[in-house]
Curated annotation (Swiss-Prot):
Gene label: ruvA
Molecular-function GO terms, alphabetical: ATP binding; four-way junction DNA binding; four-way junction helicase activity
GO terms under cellular component: cytoplasm; Holliday junction helicase complex; Holliday junction resolvase complex
Domain notes: Has three domains with a flexible linker between the domains II and III and assumes an 'L' shape. Domain III is highly mobile and contacts RuvB.
Localization of this protein: Cytoplasm
Location of the region described as Domain III in the Swiss-Prot/TrEMBL record: 159-207
Pfam families xrefs: HHH_5, RuvA_C, RuvA_N
NCBIfam families, alphabetized: ruvA (TIGR00084)
Protein name: Holliday junction branch migration complex subunit RuvA
Classification lineage: Bacteria, Pseudomonadati, Pseudomonadota, Gammaproteobacteria, Alteromonadales
Domain of life: Bacteria
Length: 207
């Protein structure tokens, strides 16, 4: 089981990164919250991972801390929720926000997430309510040194047409339809916004 990677980021293309550890490049898919907590390509990063082995592939999913990874693991226990949908959910809201939705039976909010229909939202509430009853939001002992490496210290650059395209591509990869993704980006775009801000604002506007 690969549970943690520390190395140099070679590439960043939302929602995936390529990180080199001891000469080996690992492709890792992350929720947007974790993706944009990473530094720029060429810098060192630490990623907590969940390793999935399938008949046709071996996949790594990455997270900023153990808390977010723990929520991902709870999500994929739900019938009908796979890793891709779990990433989309954690991209649309934080783990703590999701817990509040479950506790409040907020089906109308959950169905606004990509790939989550009414039946899936209801199933999430039914299957997870008891399991998340004592969810504290604790960081599950993520070492402080790891957090420091994971913190994003880069300066945001001004948004361009490429930033818009990248943001739309990221939303589509999360499960949003291209037309809806483009519309959401156009609605929130303000001159000077970078790709990260575009994605964050568009996701928030669709909830």
């Amino acid at each position: 089981m690969i549970g943690r990677l520390r190395g140099v980021l070679l590439e960043k293309q939302p929602p995936e990164v390529l990180i080199e550890v001891s000469g080996i490049g690992y492709e890792v898919q992350l929720p947007m919250s974790s993706f944009y907590a990473l530094p720029d390509a060429g810098q060192e990063a630490i990623i907590y991972t969940h390793f999935v082995v399938r008949e046709d592939a071996q996949l790594l999913y990455g997270f900023a801390d153990k808390h977010e990874r723990a929520m991902f693991r709870e999500l994929i226990k739900v019938n009908g929720v796979g890793p891709k949908l779990a990433l989309a959910i954690l991209s649309g809201m934080s783990a703590n926000q999701f817990v509040q939705c479950i506790h409040n039976d907020a089906v109308t909010t959950l169905v606004k997430l990509p790939g989550v229909g009414k039946k899936t939202a209801e199933r999430l509430v039914v299957e997870m309510k008891d399991r998340l009853k004592n969810w504290t939001g604790a960081d599950l002992l993520t070492p402080a040194s790891d957090k420091m490496v994971f913190e994003n210290e880069f300066t945001n650059s001004a948004a361009s047409g490429n930033a818009k395209d990248e943001a739309i591509s990221a939303l589509v990869s999360l499960g949003y339809k291209p037309v809806l993704a483009e519309k959401a980006i156009q609605q929130v775009y303000v001159e000077g916004m970078d790709c990260e801000a575009l994605i964050r604002s568009s996701l928030k506007s669709m909830l």
